[in-house]
Amino acid sequence: MLPYNQDFYNEDEALKDDHCEGAGNVSNPPTLDEAIKRSQDFLLSQQYPEGYWWAELEGNPTITSHTVILYKILGIEDEYPMDKMEKYLRRMQCIHGGWELFYGDGGQLSVTIESYVALRLLNVPPTDPALKKALKFIIDKGGVXKSRMFTKICLALLGCFDWRGIPSLPPWVMLLPGWFLSSIYETACWARGCVVPLIVVFDKKPVFKVSPEVSFDELYAEGREHACKTLPFCGDWTSHFFIAVDRVFKMMERLGVVPFQQWGIREAEKWLLERQEDTGDFLGVYPPMFYSVVCMKTLGYEVTDPVVRRALLSFKKFSIERADECSVQSSLSPVWDTALVVRSLVESGLPPDHPALQRAGEWLLQKQITKHGDWSFKNQSGVAGGWAFQFFNRWYPDLDDSAVVVMALDCLKLPNEDVKNGAITRCLKWISSMQCKGGGWAAFDKDNHQHWINSTPFSDLKAMVDPSTTDISARVLEMVGRLKLHGTSFDEAHFLPPESIARGLVYLRREQENEGCWFGRWGVNYIYGTCGALVALSLVAPMTHEEEIARGARWLVQVQNMHGKKINGPQDGGWGETCFSYNDPALKGQGDVSTASQTAWALQGLLAAGDALGKYEVESIGHGVQYLLSTQRKDGSWHESQFTGGGFPIHFYLRYHFYAQHFTLSSLARYRTRLQASKIKPPIP
């Protein structure tokens, strides 16, 4: 299944060529009005008849590799186009032999091991040149012993890694009340969705026979017979503590003394069945779906069982199948894409009652979630009313999507305005109730910040909790500012209370870095976080935050890719930040190439700062706009191969295929609005 018209994006792997980044009409760029019109036309051409927009959500090859492994475990590989998946995996291999976490990262060990395993399961012999190169890469990086926990779990399921090297998750964890310190509800929903099925899997420790039978002994740098069968130490006292606890759990397992074992397993099974959507999804994201199906297989569910069949159908919905390749996405993003496209089209001048926008608005209204989900365990007084990221995910609405949808709906004129306003009011109440104690907002839960959980042996990705973040907190505050700016006719009680806004502003001020930037959790990285914070502060409290706004704007100007500001890297007037800035803060705002989406974010931040300060960085903004104009393609789109979406910093990134479209259109539209109002002067040619 292909989201939107893929023909434009199939470009013989220009995707992996950094030199094509930003390739467009450099010699004859369109005018500002022409670029905006072309972009509008392009986006309108991508709308589905039902009213939504939906583009590919590209990740790394891990998701596709896991799908190969799963279907081999289930023995139904003939139900998936495995030959096309092999072609995809082969194409994604880099010249050094590894597979990458994001384009240009030099290869990543765990991604490479999982891709190698998938190809071997697809009957590719170890003597194949591609696998010989991959094996050398793996051994040079330390082999299986240095890979992440999820990689080791996959190998353990195939009998190729010792279960003693996998942490224990005693089933009685399922019986802990929601308020308990180590309850499953103290973990982030994405972690929770993996922990619950893995409680069953870790208890049963299954080994599945697959065809062809493989050992993968060659992946152990030290030889499998010498491989360490205990959990690795991380060097701090918490690591020592949890490993000691794990040894106790394992000793109890060997002695057959596991309290409430069967009860806990039944509760885990019940929990999963309750949360499976009618469409088959578990939480709407790939890892919980993968482990939930493995859990069902472990519990004895047949492949023909309706629970399993529905789940397998959802895997196919996550697939991108082309003429000769097939890959799998980590999730689907129609609500997110639709809301952001709607905002960009209205901002750029499309009438709020345009038929395409009305269809989108009606579709969004249908997707509001009015039933309580997992979020209510820590927010029992909240009124349900948020939106989720996906087509269906009723248990897990999120704050980011909800705030963006509210802003999108607010700028539309729909046939039934009362229904629209009622939906917005309900969502505002929910968002207000989700504010965390520290003043910020998180993605899915309230006060989900027990950071000690990240020290458990299971959490080598350090993503077990869902704390407040700058970008989501800023989005909520931007929403409040936009509603008031548009003169939306809600009672003051329907907005966030003044004390909540004040606490949110204190949180944003506290999170600002010394350089003036803000960290970005869900977009790469400091450019994203800084843009969000500047937009929010300029809308909600510009007079009392002039210093913070000025510092943020100065930082954006300093990291722009312009001659005289940078010795190395591009000097094209755009902005670009590498995913490596999560590994090394010294790379804040730095990158090898400029990108359309990150340039758009920077422009939004600078324009907002100019509104607040009464003075715009005209030269910097002008160069950024010129970069976008000169890189637009003839059909009105922008090409971007870089990963600018956040998943799990350092461990998983995303490339939203519409980010280079709607964010860019919004930025150009905001620039034009200020030109027309004579707030900003055009740059001197």
Curated annotation (Swiss-Prot):
Keyword Isomerase carried by entry? yes
Q: Which regions form coiled coils?
A: none
Positions annotated as active site in the UniProt record: 400
Q: What are the ranges of the PFTB repeats?
A: 82-123, 265-308, 424-465, 621-672
Assigned EC number: 5.4.99.37
The entry's keywords: Isomerase, Repeat
A single GO cellular-component term from the record reads:
lipid droplet
Top EC class, one word: isomerase
Q: Which reaction does it catalyse?
A: squalene = dammara-20,24-diene
One Gene Ontology molecular-function label: intramolecular transferase activity
**Record has tRNA-binding as a keyword:** no
Q: Name one GO biological process term.
A: triterpenoid biosynthetic process
Q: Which family is annotated?
A: Belongs to the terpene cyclase/mutase family.
Function, as annotated = Squalene cyclase producing the tetracyclic triterpene dammaradiene.
NCBIfam families membership: hopene_cyclase, squalene_cyclas
What protein does this entry describe? Answer: Dammaradiene synthase
Q: What is the lineage of its organism?
A: Eukaryota, Viridiplantae, Streptophyta, Embryophyta, Tracheophyta
Gene name tied to this protein = DCD
